[in-house]
Amino acid sequence: MEPVFDTFLLVEAYVRSDVSYTIDGRLNPSFFDTEELEEMTSNTYTTWGAVRHHIFNVIKGNKLPLNFKIVLILSDANINRIIEQNHLNLTTSDIANLSLNIYFDGEKISLTTMASMNIFSMDKTLANIWDANVSAFFKQNQIF
């Protein structure tokens, strides 16, 4: 598996094959020392890169999984970068998350994006920018 998504944060991963596997991406802060916590991108969720090999080991094999779902979100630093680059009148605290949902139903993969806000807004600018960023990311990494 390529490290393309390694900087994304993992909210959850679910794989259903011979048995069902669920990985909660929430970090257990008591497991880490202070220095390790300070070095992390997020103190809430692990990065995809930190668990990618575990999930790959669950998915690989002679048979495809029956289905799987992976929910990734951007770090606050990357959300802030999008805000600044697009001159949005928002702060990172206004945005709950920018997510990328990957779902395999046994035959095809569906990718959906979502911009979740902590404030009420009818403005869909952020959602449209997030969609465009994901499309550009896929193109840059030759995914589609």
Regions found by a protein language model. Give the residues of each.
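Surface-exposed, low-hydrophobicity interaction/linker segments
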Residues: E39-E107
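Short, surface-exposed, charged/polar-biased interaction segments
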Residues: T22, R26, T91, I119, ...
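Phenylalanine-focused residue identity feature
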Residues: F5-F8, F31-F32, F56, F68, ...
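Generic "edge-of-domain/loop-turn" microfeature
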Residues: L10, V15, N28, A77-I79, ...
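Charge-rich, low-complexity N-terminal segments
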Residues: M1-W48
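Mixed-charge, glycine-accented linear interaction segment located at domain edges/termini
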Residues: I109-F144
